[in-house]
Amino acid sequence: MTDQAERGAAIVVRDLTKSYPIAGKAGTAPEGGAGAPPDGGRKGKRGARMRKHVLDGVSFTVPAGSIVSFLGHNGAGKTTLIRILSTLITADSGEVSIFSRDVKEDPAGVRADIATTGQFAAIDENLTGRENLEFFGRLRGLDRADAAARATELLAQFSLADSASTLASAYSGGMRRRLDIAASLCVVPRLLFLDEPTTGLDPVSREELWGFIRQLRDDGMTLVLTTQYLEEAEALADHVHLLKDRRIVASGTPEELRRDFGSHVLRVSFATAAGAEAFARCLRGACLDRARVAGKMVSLSLIHI
């Protein structure tokens, strides 16, 4: 990443890696493969912990005031990435800064600027819509009067005013997701993480939620969302990162990805990101300016050769 790309960015991530320990057989290290430990899993090494590698050398920036989407299948590392960015867990290595604050050195400062909505609604079904929002407002430090006033604003903003006194248990799936996102905005964050926000919604509810998400971006908020749906990334995102096998394998605007990956593509993987950058510079020097770099991978649409 260049200094120019990082300047004014909401998020800067460099060489992020994350793995989890997994149960091994009688405490013996595995022989290798996807679950092998960093030492390669030498045979017979007693007491070694097998590890599942979830993220490997992930780097990217998120411009302030944009919607950036991470697209990938289940298990691609999307939720782990969001959990690291939102300070819920720490990475094994790499650097993460949010609005110039390091997530390890100043997690409290980072949390003051962000909000997160997970895959499953965090609302209390035994409370009404209004009671849920007032409750979350109080949790975020608002006094009773301010929490009530903010709840009224959010109910109107997310088209829930007519259901304000209805128990959340009676809400439809789309209404619950809107209420869940509204609860994240009781104190307006600079950055909102949305982890698969439309999972399980019908097409009409999904389109409605997309409209609310776009409005938040238009109001100046930065949003990072994960999704399994290509059409959702295309509909919402200013920039898309494709996560596969623990790495970002493609990045660009939706239009760029359609253009560059809508035909046969040559992909070359390197041991280091520096090697990939050097190779891409050589290609661009040969007038192949469509060479794209994503971490340690260089991609070139063959239609441009």
What is the meaning of each model-derived region?
Residues G8-V13, K18-K25, E31, D39-K244, ...:
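ABC transporter nucleotide-binding domains
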Residues M1-Q4:
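N-terminal acidic, proline/glycine-rich, low-complexity intrinsically disordered segments
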Residues I303-I305:
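Conserved small/polar residues in nucleotide/adenosyl-binding loops
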Residues G211-S301:
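ABC transporter nucleotide-binding domain
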